[in-house]
C-alpha cells in the first residue's frame, strides 16, 4: 500500500488543529507522547507499509517479529492517521486521568503487542479452519486494534447510557460490537480480525486475567496510581477541568481548563465522527482509483505484490 502523495495532508492538519484547540498542556503526557509518536512515524516511516504490516506469513513463519512493534505505529494515509489519533485523544484524556500516566503507558504498550498477537492467532485459526492460506498472507497496519481495546476499557469504567451509531441508539456495553460490524460493512477494506483482536484484548483486561497478570509483572505500581492531589472531571453539562483533592480542606477548589469541543468537532460526538468517517470512506472509494481505503489498515496479498512491482519499476 502506498501513501497518497498528492496535495496537502488535510487529515494531519486537522489532527494538529484538534490537538492545539484542546491545548497541549491539557493533554496528559502519555497520551500526548502516543500522538506525537504516531505522527512522527507517519512523517518519517521506518519502513514501507508492506515491510511493517502484520501477517502470519511474515511475522510467524519468517520470524519477522519486529512487525509486532511497527504495525500499530504506521498508517495508510493522513485520514487513517487522523481518525485513529482523534479517537486516541479523547480515550487517552479519559483513561489516563483515571489510571494514571505510568499505568496507562503500560496498558498502551501491552495492548499494542497483544492486539498483534491475538490478530495473528485469529488469522492462523481462520486459515487452518477454512483451509485458506491467503489468510496467513493478509497484512494489517494501524492503531485501530489498540483503540478498540481502549474503547472496551472506557465503556467498562463508564457503564450505562447509549451512543448514537449510524443514527441508532446503542447501549454502551454493545457499542464496540456494533462498531466492529458497521465498520466492516461500510468500509470492507478494513481488517475485521484486527478490530476483533482489540475487543478481545480489552475483554481479557476487564473480564479476564490480563489485568492481574500485568499487575503481577509490574510489581512496584498498579492501576490505582493517579495524579497526586489533582483529579480530572467532566460532566454531562460540558464543563470540565482539574480539581485539587485535599483530604483536610479546600475540596471544592478547581482550576478551569477550557475545552470548547464544538469549535473543532462541529458538535459531533465520537460515534457521529465515526459515522462521518464511514460515509467519507464510501465517497472517497467511489471517486478515487488505485488508492488504498482511507481508514482501513488491511493489505491483501495482491496489493502487496502490486506494491513490490511498483517499487521495482520506479527504481
Swiss-Prot record:
Regulation: Inhibited by aprotinin.
Subcellular location: Endoplasmic reticulum membrane; Mitochondrion membrane
EC top class named in words: hydrolase
Pfam families reported for this sequence: Rhomboid
UniProt topological domain (Cytoplasmic) ranges: 1-21, 128-138, 202-315
Annotated tissue distribution: Expressed strongly in testis.
EC numbers for this chain: 3.4.21.105
Any GO BP annotation: positive regulation of protein catabolic process
Main location: endoplasmic reticulum
Chain positions covered by the region annotation VCP/p97-interacting motif (VIM): 301-315
Ranges annotated as biased composition (Basic and acidic residues): 300-315
Source taxon at top rank: Eukaryota
Start and end residues of each stretch annotated as Ubiquitin-binding domain (UBD): 269-284
Region annotation Disordered: where it falls in the sequence: 283-315
TM ranges: 22-42, 107-127, 139-157, 181-201
UniProt catalytic activity: Cleaves type-1 transmembrane domains using a catalytic dyad composed of serine and histidine that are contributed by different transmembrane domains
Keywords carried by this UniProt record: Apoptosis, Differentiation, Endoplasmic reticulum, Hydrolase, Membrane, Mitochondrion, Protease, Serine protease, Spermatogenesis, Transmembrane, Transmembrane helix
Segments on the Extracellular face: 43-106, 158-180
Gene Ontology MF terms in the entry: endopeptidase activity; serine-type endopeptidase activity
Induction cue: Up-regulated by endoplasmic reticulum stress agents that induce the unfolded protein response (UPR).
GO cellular component terms, A-Z: endoplasmic reticulum; endoplasmic reticulum membrane; endoplasmic reticulum quality control compartment; mitochondrial membrane
Subunit text: Interacts (via C-terminal domain) with VCP. Interacts with ubiquitin and ubiquitinated proteins. Interacts with BIK and STEAP3.
Annotated PANTHER family: RHOMBOID-RELATED PROTEIN, RHOMBOID-RELATED PROTEIN 4
Family statement drawn from the similarity comment of this UniProt entry: Belongs to the peptidase S54 family.
Biological role: Intramembrane-cleaving serine protease that cleaves single transmembrane or multi-pass membrane proteins in the hydrophobic plane of the membrane, luminal loops and juxtamembrane regions. Involved in regulated intramembrane proteolysis and the subsequent release of functional polypeptides from their membrane anchors. Functional component of endoplasmic reticulum-associated degradation (ERAD) for misfolded membrane proteins. Required for the degradation process of some specific misfolded endoplasmic reticulum (ER) luminal proteins.
Descriptive protein name: Rhomboid-related protein 4
Species of provenance: Homo sapiens
Gene that produces this protein: RHBDD1
Amino acid at each position: 500500500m502506498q501513501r497518497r502523495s498528492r496535495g496537502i495532508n488535510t487529515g494531519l492538519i486537522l489532527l494538529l488543529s484538534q490537538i492545539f484547540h484542546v491545548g497541549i498542556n491539557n493533554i496528559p503526557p502519555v497520551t500526548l507522547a502516543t500522538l506525537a509518536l504516531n505522527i512522527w512515524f507517519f512523517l518519517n516511516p521506518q519502513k514501507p507499509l508492506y515491510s511493517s504490516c502484520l501477517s502470519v506469513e511474515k511475522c510467524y513463519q519468517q520470524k519477522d517479529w519486529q512487525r509486532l512493534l511497527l504495525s500499530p505505529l504506521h498508517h495508510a494515509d493522513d485520514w487513517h492517521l487522523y481518525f485513529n489519533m482523534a479517537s486516541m485523544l479523547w480515550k487517552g484524556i479519559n483513561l489516563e486521568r483515571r489510571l494514571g500516566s505510568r499505568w496507562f503507558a503500560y496498558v498502551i504498550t501491552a495492548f499494542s503487542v497483544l492486539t498483534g498477537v491475538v490478530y495473528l492467532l485469529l488469522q492462523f485459526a481462520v486459515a487452518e479452519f477454512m483451509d485458506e492460506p491467503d489468510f496467513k498472507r493478509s497484512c494489517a497496519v494501524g492503531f485501530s486494534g489498540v483503540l478498540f481495546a481502549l474503547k472496551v476499557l472506557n465503556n467498562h469504567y463508564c457503564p450505562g447510557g447509549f451512543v448514537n451509531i449510524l443514527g441508532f441508539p446503542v447501549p454502551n456495553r454493545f457499542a464496540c460490537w456494533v462498531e466492529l460490524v458497521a465498520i466492516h460493512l461500510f468500509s470492507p477494506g478494513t481488517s475485521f480480525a484486527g478490530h476483533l483482536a482489540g475487543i478481545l484484548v480489552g475483554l481479557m483486561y476487564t473480564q479476564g486475567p490480563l489485568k492481574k497478570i500485568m499487575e503481577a509483572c509490574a510489581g512496584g505500581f498498579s492501576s490505582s496510581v493517579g495524579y497526586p492531589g489533582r483529579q480530572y472531571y467532566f460532566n454531562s453539562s460540558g464543563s470540565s477541568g482539574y480539581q485539587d483533592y485535599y483530604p483536610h480542606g479546600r475540596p471544592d477548589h478547581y482550576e478551569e481548563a477550557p475545552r470548547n469541543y464544538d469549535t473543532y468537532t462541529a458538535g459531533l460526538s465520537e460515534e457521529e465522527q465515526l459515522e462521518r468517517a464511514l460515509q467519507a470512506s464510501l465517497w472517497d472509494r467511489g471517486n478515487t482509483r488505485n488508492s488504498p481505503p482511507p481508514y482501513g489498515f488491511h493489505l491483501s496479498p495482491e496489493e502487496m505484490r502490486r506494491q513490490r512491482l511498483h517499487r521495482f519499476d520506479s527504481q
